[in-house]
């Protein structure tokens, strides 16, 4: 059982205007969290807080302190490696074909730029892959507010996808250190993609989700090639980053190959969700009419 400890709070019924200077200067300890939010075991820091918001102290099942602030123990999971990696949506309609060939066209410059540097390729892929879920979730959130209706859980499902993809990036940042020009490329690619996807989702959610479905199929292919290079010895099979071991509940002696396997499984789950979404639209329904696959990965 995961445990969260909160410091005991004083009376909170008084107005903040009535609080005296001593309360204003009260220091609230940061619970040993690293300033970076990554929880890397660095020095403890404290903050001066007028508002008295208590930091939580999270412990593992064995009672030891949880060191990550960017995710919590109840958000970790074991990846389902049994998922079918070969599934493919054959494009039949005009929108399907447009989505398919758009993704295929985007693959060529990526192949040319990264070639067989799969660590950097994975890092760049995840900076883009984390965008659609956030954009789609935000637009569905606004739609839910405008129409005074539930989303069927799709807001949460898409935001979960975005967070999961972001954790992929945080993991590969530990493995592949990007050069300055690769960081600059992230600014350019992300700036273009987030706006393009935003407009696409406004015009046609089913096209937007289909594009992501095909992007995830390409991601599965990329990680499969990554595994082949690891097996050939062309890429060093280094120990798995600590963040990956805790996030996917991997054994302590896990390696980069184990990380790539679980990431590829995640991408296969995202593929299924994003191909499922346009199928709902094609059958004359809205996403809210079909329960969202929350926690599917």
UniProtKB/Swiss-Prot annotation:
Enzyme class: oxidoreductase
Protein name per Swiss-Prot or TrEMBL: Ubiquinol oxidase 2, mitochondrial
Annotated spans, Disordered: 17-43
Reactions the enzyme catalyzes: 2 a ubiquinol + O2 = 2 a ubiquinone + 2 H2O
Binding site residues for Fe cation 2: 165, 216, 267, 270
Taxonomic source organism: Nicotiana tabacum
Alphabetic keyword roster: Disulfide bond, Electron transport, Iron, Membrane, Metal-binding, Mitochondrion, Mitochondrion inner membrane, Oxidoreductase, Respiratory chain, Transit peptide, Transmembrane, Transmembrane helix, Transport
Membrane-topology descriptor: Multi-pass membrane protein
Similarity comment: Belongs to the alternative oxidase family.
TM region positions: 122-142, 184-204
Record's cofactor remark: Binds 2 iron ions per subunit.
GO molecular function: alternative oxidase activity; metal ion binding; superoxide-generating NADPH oxidase activity; ubiquinol:oxygen oxidoreductase activity
UniProt-listed PANTHER family: ALTERNATIVE OXIDASE
Binding site residues for Fe cation 1: 126, 165, 168, 267
Subunit structure: Homodimer; disulfide-linked.
Localization of this protein: Mitochondrion inner membrane
InterPro entries: AOX (IPR002680), AOX_sf (IPR038659)
Enzyme nomenclature, EC number: 1.10.3.11
């Amino acid at each position: 059982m995961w445990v969260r400890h909160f410091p005991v709070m004083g009376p909170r019924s008084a107005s903040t205007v009535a609080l005296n200077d001593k309360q204003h200067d009260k220091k609230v300890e940061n619970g040993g969290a690293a300033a970076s939010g990554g929880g890397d075991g660095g020095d403890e820091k404290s903050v001066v807080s007028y508002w008295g918001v208590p930091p939580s102290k999270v412990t593992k099942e064995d009672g030891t302190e949880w060191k990550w602030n960017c995710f919590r123990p109840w958000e970790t999971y074991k990846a389902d490696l049994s998922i079918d990696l070969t599934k493919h949506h054959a494009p039949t309609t005009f929108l399907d074909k447009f989505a398919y060939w758009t993704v295929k066209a985007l693959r060529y410059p990526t192949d040319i730029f990264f070639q067989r540097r799969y660590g950097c390729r994975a890092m760049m892929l995840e900076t883009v892959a984390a965008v659609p879920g956030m954009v789609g979730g935000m637009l569905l959130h606004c739609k839910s507010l405008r129409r005074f209706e539930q989303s069927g859980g799709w807001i949460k499902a898409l935001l979960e996808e975005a967070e999961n993809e972001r954790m992929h990036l945080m993991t590969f940042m530990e493995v592949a250190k990007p050069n300055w020009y690769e960081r600059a490329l992230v600014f350019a690619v992300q700036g273009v993609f987030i706006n393009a996807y935003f407009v696409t989702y406004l015009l046609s959610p089913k096209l937007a989700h289909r594009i992501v479905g095909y992007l995830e199929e390409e991601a599965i292919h990329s990680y499969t090639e990554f595994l082949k290079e690891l097996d050939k010895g062309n890429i060093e099979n280094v120990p798995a980053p600590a963040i990956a071991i805790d996030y996917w509940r991997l054994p302590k002696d896990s390696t980069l190959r184990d990380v790539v396997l679980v990431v590829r499984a995640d991408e296969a789950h995202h593929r299924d969700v994003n191909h499922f979404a346009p199928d709902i639209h094609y059958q004359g329904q809205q996403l809210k009419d079909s329960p969202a696959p929350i926690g599917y990965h």
